[in-house]
Each structure stands twice: as C-alpha cells, then as structure tokens.
Amino acid sequence: MTPITFSSKWRHGRPLLLAGLALALAACASSRGLQPHGALRDVDSLHSERTLADASLGAAGFPARDWWTALGDPQLDALISEGLASHPSLEAADARLRQARSQVGGARADQLPNLSVSGGYTGLRLPESMLGEETGGHYAGSGQVAFNFSYGVDLWGGKRATWEAAVDSAHAAAVDAQAARLNLSANITQAYAGLAYAWQLHDVAAEELARSQKALQLTRQRRAAGIDSDLQVRQAESRVPAAQQQLQAAQQQIDEGRTALAALVGQGPDRGLRIERPHALDPMALQLPGVLPSALLGRRPDIVAARWRVEAAGKQIDAAKAKFYPSLNLTALAGVVAPDVGDLLQSSSTFAYIGPALSLPIFDGGRLRAGLDSKDADYDLAVATYNQRLVDALHEVADQVSAVRSLQQQAQSQQQAVDTARAAHGLAEQRYRAGIGGYLDVLTAQSTLLQAQQRLAGLQSQQVLSSVRLSQALGGGFEPSADDSRRAASLSDSSHS
C-alpha cells in the first residue's frame, strides 16, 4: 500500500483551499460606498481682501509672545506672570496634554511585540482507596517556566494609522495648552484695562464732586449777598450727593475689578487688595501688522489645533478601513517543564510552540461598516469645525480692525468735545460768579462736561480693549512649531480620500 505523503495531501487539497479562500474573500465585510463628505475651505475663498485692504495697522510683525509688555505697566506684567504660574485652567490644559501624550505611547506599544514570562508548580496526590497501591497514595508534581510571545502583524497599516492619529491629537492638545495661556494673558489684560477704566470714572466723579462743592459754596455766597434764592442753593446742594454716588459707584467698580483680577491670577479676593492703580494704557503701543489672511492660518492656535484634529480624524479612517482586511497574529511559547524543579535546566525538559493565526472578517452584522461610517462622520465634523474656525477668525480680525480704526477717530473727536465742554463750563462759571449768568447755565455746562468726560473715558477704555482683542484675533502671540507651520502650509480644499 502506497503511503500518503504530506506533499500529495497538499497537492490534492490545494484547489479546495484556494477555492475556500477565494469564497471567503468574496464574502468578507466590505467598506464599499463609505467615505467622508467634508471639504476643507481655503482662506482665499472667503474673500476678505477688500475689507482688510485699508487696515493700515503698521509694518510690525504678528503679536509677540509677550505682546502685553508693550503697554509698559510692570504691575500688569507681574499679574500675567502670576496667572500663568498658578491658574487652574492651565493645569487642566496640561493634564489634557498629558492624556494625549499617554495615548501616543499606548498606540505605539500596540505596534510592538509582547513578551512575558510565567512560572509555576503544580502537585497532585490521588487517594489509594480509589486507584490502588500502584497508582494511588503517591505524590506527583511538575514545575514549569515559559516565555510567551505574541505579535499582531500590521499588514495594512491600521496600527500605524492609529498611532499617527494619536500623534496628531497630541499636537492639537499641545496647541490647546498654548492657547489656554495666551487666552489667559489676554483676559488678564482686558480685566486690567477694565480696572484702569474704573479709575478713570473715579477721577471724573471726583472732579465732578469738586465742581459741585465749589458751585454750592459760590451759590451760598450769592444767596448771602442777596443775588440767589434758596431754590438755587437747593439745586446746588442736590448736585453734591449725586456726585458722591457716582464716586461710590466708581469705587465699587474698582473693587470688583480687583477681585476679578485676583480670580484670573488664580488667587483669593485678598490678592486684589494689593493691586495698585494701573498706569495709563496707550492702545497705540500695541503695534499690529498689516493683516495677510493666508498668514493667519499658522498664527491662530484654534485654527492650527482644528487642522491637527482633521488630520487625526483622517488617520482614524485609515485605521477603520484596515479592519476590513485579514489580520495575522503570531504567538509562540517556549520553556521548560519537569517533575522535579532541579531537572528544569536539563535539555530534555524544554518545549516550544508556535502558532500563526490568520483572521478574516466575513460577517459581523455590519459592525465594521458602522465603525467606519462613524469615523467618516468624525472627519466631517472635524472639517466643519475647522471651516467654522476659519470663518470666525477672519470675521474677528475684520471686526477688531474696524473697531480700532473707528475708536481712534471717535476718541479724537470726543477729546475735542471735552475741551469745548470744559471751556464752556469755565465761561458759565465766570459769568455766574460775576453775576451776569444764571445757575441754570452752570448746571447745563457742568452736566455736558460730565457726560463728555465719561464718554471719553469709555472710548479710551474701548480703544485698549479693541487693541487687545485684535492682538488675540491675530493669534495672541502664538508661536507655531515647525510641524504646525508645515501642517498649515499643507492646507487644501480636498476631502480625505
């Protein structure tokens, strides 16, 4: 009888194996018809050239990382440094960055083989009453030490795509951490400008109180001289508590501004008690560039982070597609086993096992397609978020450019109004003192001057705030890394394929 060899078995079984493999491939889960629909928008397609053409903001570069130092207030510099060192929101951003980086490490580990070692000892004694004297009543044991090896071969790049997605997400988290610091700096500067405005209102109210007290004194003198009546005195007296109320309201605004700054630097309310009056902040000290929309892409941290998340979502699609293809897993086991621990080092005690395994998804109830469709939707969401960030950024820049330009002109006009109102008040007071003018003229001129001074203080505060907001809209001093710059430069309006 002719023995059946392995080669003859393989020769006769190969057609059947190939046919089965072909059938399995034809029946396996398919990603056909699934793809994302989002398309990245190009900044040039949003047409902001005419709006920003007349900005004339200067020839300086984008805001420096410490742009607020241009305002020349050491106390502001110290407050921002304190906030950057201790604010809880920054600790949260740093924690999210550590989470993202740990996910990079986990994804990297999934690409590498696993090796472990195990050892143990088992013993058994069977009862003599059941097995007799020859077998029962004796103790038998064995010890073993084994090395376990496993490796999932990344045939289709799915694991690498998952790792690359984690890397891109970590880049986004790093940009978010920078953005949190830049936003905190801008928020502290805006709150500081608000405190400066409160002090300006305090000055205006104090000046109004002094004018009211002076007018009351003069009116009493005129009544004593028989020129004015009690009516004029009562009118003058009513102006004093009104001015005192405005002074008290300004002081309340100062106190609230100090408390707000204390919170922004991550401290308790008592920290605000040590905040002195701010220096006069000059909005023109913040030198800003002539805006180039294309350069804005790499300077806005929210746009850069959104771009990284688009890239991460695209890599997740690649990883999801790889799950539709066969997977190969290698496992191996090698070690020693012996009935006596002392015999473990003998060559006769060694054993080994290797078992490659190929897995192919055929029917999973639509799980893989649902997973891929979900990743496609994630990509579309990331693209939509990026596009919205881009639109918002251009509108923020355009709005603040317009505000800076308009407020500068308004402040100049309002300064002229204050000068005119001050002169009119002085003239009305002189006429009243000389007895040729009425107290109503003084009241009217005084009210006009007060309102003009309050409006000027408000416009000057808005000037500083608009300059700060424009600095923030232009990136707030964000300094992109080389990877960030390359990612911004690679922008295209084609969707992930």
Give short role names for the model-derived ranges.
Residues 80, 144-148, 192, 237, ...:
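Membrane-embedded beta-strand positions in outer-membrane beta-barrel channels/transporters
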Residues 223-227, 432-436, 473-477:
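A short glycine-centered flexible hinge/capping loop motif at secondary-structure junctions
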Residues 29-187, 328-332, 362-372:
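Short flexible linkers and secondary-structure junctions
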Residues 2-6, 14-85, 143, 167, ...:
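Terminal intrinsically disordered/low-complexity segments used for targeting and assembly
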Residues 91-92, 108, 153-181, 231, ...:
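Sec/SRP-type N-terminal targeting helices
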Residues 62-71, 120-148, 162, 271-289, ...:
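Small/polar, glycine/serine/threonine/aspartate-rich low-complexity segments that form flexible
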Residues 175-292, 403, 427-430, 448-450, ...:
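Periplasmic alpha-helical coiled-coil/stalk elements that build and connect Gram-negative outer-membrane
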